[in-house]
Structures are given as structure tokens and as C-alpha cells.
A protein has these predicted regions:
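Acidic/polar N-terminal loop/beta-strand segments that form early-domain functional surfaces
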Residues: 37-40, 66
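Conserved nucleotide-sugar phosphate-binding/catalytic loop shared by glycosyltransferases and other
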Residues: 58
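Conserved N-terminal alpha-helix of the aminotransferase class I/II PLP-enzyme fold
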Residues: 63-96
Length: 396
């Protein structure tokens, strides 16, 4: 069967692949503990669900403008002003079917065939594939655990050439959980402005910060704002992953192009979910504080337990809800008759023998790590770490 070369170049998501295996095992009645998907285990706050029900009862079930309702786009502008100190007009906002969709629109809007996009590693697994879908070329910028998985302005500058069009910046980061300081962002912004490089700033985890605070690079200076495409949404902050609402804030010409692209691909996002998002952005934020408190407690417990296991280690993340566990010392060991040579080997053996689902970071740009998510109950975390600890003790 004929399949396009572009389609064949796209790799499957390792995150969704491991999560699918986990869910199938669970459906088969197997006692398996999962740490794969990046999804809060909290319910969507009731006031948001009530707003959706109200919208249904009021007949808000028709097409909306492709870029989203004016009401929602104005609510997003208010959020950006109040929380980030950024001034946008509603015509600079495009609401999409999740932040992932917003990212796809952004790459489609700014890339010509062969344009390069710098992506710091470890990275979220979908970034390189999205760039390839837009006929761009992903260029991986490696970071180290010793540098807290952060790249420097100097490394960024050294990676730029005549084909460089954009940088992907994800802070707080999936999968590392690291957060760039305002000073670090200022240095990065200086390089971007001097070289006229777009920054795709993925800020989906901005409210899940446990030390310090997240700063949008667009707020560094007006010149940087003109080169920034902010990507955000409500999935992580408001436990609304299934509602599929993301948004972008960009210079008006880029926003218009992104809206045009979306109008031919999906039309508008779900009208009911848009109404619910207005309520989310306008309502009380108490539930966020409750989630953050729980995530912080889980993070602290997970980090302490992992670092007590011989043969593995991890840094303490500052944000998001992930921990990267370094398994490099386990490479070359066996578990039973299975040789561990990669993060995939480790994750597959762990799932098969210990019934624990972790995400291998081969698809995240660094094969020495596996990713945990602490967006699950403390009970699951304790049980999962116990199983992993016992599993590692059996390696030889």
C-alpha cells in the first residue's frame, strides 16, 4: 500500500504507546501500576462542569469563529495581562483543539521546507515530529543533568545558522520539570532578538511551579514579544485534558495565518468546551492550590525514594509533574535473561516483570532516563516505587 514519505518519517509517541500497553493490561485484569500519561488525576472543578452544562442548555452548540469565540479570546487576553503582564488583542489569540494543535498550527505558520527548529533535549516527544510534519528540520540541542537540563544562551547561539527559524522553549519542562529563571530567559531572548529567531514558548505547565515562579519569555522585552508564539491551554492547570482546549498568542499576522490553517483543518474547537474554559479562566483558583499542594508532596516523596535506590538517581524538578530517573548505571546489566541496553529495554522489562509502566526517554532525546509522572495517587507512587526497587535489586 502506498504511504507518503512524510508519513513514514513520523515516529509513534512512546508516551502513548506505553500508556496503551498499561491500559490494555489493566483491562485484562492485571495488577499493573502506571506512571505514563501526563494527566492530572484530579477531576475538573465543578464550576467548570456547571458552565458547560449551562452552555448546552442555552443552546451554545453551533459553530463558532475558527479562532474561537470572542468571549473566550478576550478572557485569554485578560489572563495574559493579569498573570503575565502581556498586552494582546483578541485577534492575536487562536483557540485550538488542545495545546498540541496550537503547536502544529504554529509550525505550519512559520516554517518553509528545510527550515530548522532548535529543540533542547530532553524534549517532549511530539516536538520533532510536529516540525517534520511542517517540512521543517528538528535540530536537537543537548543539555546535561549536571546543568539541570537547561541550555545556555551561548549554546543556543552556537546552534544557529542561516536555516534556523525557531527555538522551542518549554518551561516548566516536560519531561525534566525544570524552570528557567528570568535572568536565563533574558540571555536567551537577547540571542533570539539579535538573530531574528522565533521562540515557540510552550507554557502549558506555568501554574505547576513549586519553587520560584514561571516567567514568559514574551515578557522579557517588546522585541522578544514580537518574536514569540505563546502556547498554553487548560488541560494541566484545571484538570481538563479531555476537553481539548489550547490557545496561542502571537503577533497578529501569524495569528491570522494560524487561524486560516485551522479553518481548513478542524474549523472551531468544541463550543461547549470553549464556554467551560471561559469559566475556568474567570473563576476561582482554589482548586489549583489544592492540586499544587498534592503534587508537591508527591514529588518530594518520589524524589527521596528514588534517590535511596542503589543504581538510579534523579534531580528534584521545580515544576510540571514529572521526574526523570537516571538509569545509565543499569545499562549492561541483566534482569533474568534480558539484557538492559536502553531505556526501552528497561521500561519493557519493568512492565513485563514488575507490572510498572514508566516512559522510556529514547523518544525524548536522551536514552539514559525513564520518566515518572506523579500525577497519580500517593498509594500508587508508594507501590510503584516498591516494585521498581525490588526489580532493580534483581538486576545483575
Amino acid at each position: 500500500m502506498y504511504i507518503s514519505e512524510k508519513a513514514k518519517s513520523i515516529s509513534p509517541s512512546t508516551t502513548l504507546a506505553i500508556d496503551a500497553k498499561f491500559k490494555q493490561m489493566k483491562a485484562d485484569g492485571i495488577d499493573v501500576v502506571g506512571f505514563g500519561a501526563g494527566e492530572p488525576d484530579f477531576d475538573t472543578p465543578q464550576y467548570i462542569k456547571d458552565a458547560a452544562i449551562k452552555a448546552i442548555n442555552e443552546g451554545k452548540t453551533k459553530y463558532t469563529p475558527a479562532a474561537g469565540t470572542v468571549e473566550l479570546r478576550k478572557a485569554i487576553c485578560k489572563k495574559l495581562k493579569d498573570e503575565n503582564g502581556l498586552d494582546y488583542t483578541f485577534d492575536q489569540i487562536v483557540v485550538s483543539n488542545g495545546a498540541k494543535h496550537s503547536l502544529v498550527n504554529a509550525f505550519q505558520a512559520i516554517l518553509n521546507p528545510g527550515d530548522e527548529v532548535i529543540i533542547p533535549a530532553p524534549f517532549w516527544v511530539s516536538y520533532p515530529e510536529m516540525v517534520k510534519l511542517a517540512d521543517g528540520v528538528p535540530v536537537v540541542l543537548q543539555t546535561t543533568e549536571e546543568d539541570e537540563f537547561k541550555f545556555t544562551a551561548e549554546a543556543f547561539k552556537a546552534a544557529i545558522n542561516d536555516k534556523t527559524r525557531a527555538l522551542v522553549l518549554n518551561s516548566p519542562s516536560n519531561p525534566t520539570g525544570m524552570v528557567y529563571t528570568k535572568e536565563e530567559l533574558s540571555a536567551i531572548a537577547k540571542v533570539a532578538v539579535e538573530n531574528n529567531i522565533y521562540v515557540i514558548s510552550d507554557e502549558i505547565y506555568e501554574h505547576l511551579v513549586y519553587e520560584g515562579e514561571a516567567t514568559s519569555i514574551a515578557a522579557i522585552c517588546p522585541e522578544m514579544k514580537d518574536l514569540t508564539i505563546i502556547i498554553n491551554g487548560v488541560s494541566k492547570t484545571y484538570a481538563m485534558t479531555g476537553w481539548r482546549i489550547g490557545y496561542s498568542a502571537a503577533p497578529a499576522p501569524i495569528a491570522k495565518v494560524m487561524s486560516n490553517i485551522q479553518s481548513h483543518a478542524t474549523s472551531n474547537p468544541n463550543s461547549i468546551a470553549q464556554a467551560a474554559t471561559v469559566a475556568a479562566l474567570s473563576g476561582g483558583q482554589d482548586e489549583i492550590a489544592v492540586m499544587k499542594k498534592a503534587f508537591r508532596e508527591r514529588r518530594d516523596y518520589m524524589v527521596e525514594r528514588i534517590n535511596a535506590i542503589e543504581g538510579v538517581s534523579c534531580l528534584k524538578p521545580q515544576g510540571a509533574f514529572y521526574v526523570l530517573m537516571n538509569i545509565s548505571a543499569l545499562k549492561g546489566r541483566y534482569i533474568g535473561d534480558t539484557l538492559i541496553n536502553s531505556s526501552d529495554d528497561f521500561a519493557n522489562a519493568l512492565l513485563e516483570k514488575a507490572k510498572v509502566a514508566l516512559v522510556p526517554c529514547s523518544g525524548f532525546g536522551n536514552d539514559n532516563f525513564v520518566r515518572w509522572s506523579y500525577a497519580t495517587s500517593m498509594e500508587n507512587i508508594k507501590e510503584g516505587i516498591d516494585r521498581v526497587e525490588n526489580f532493580i535489586k534483581l538486576t545483575h
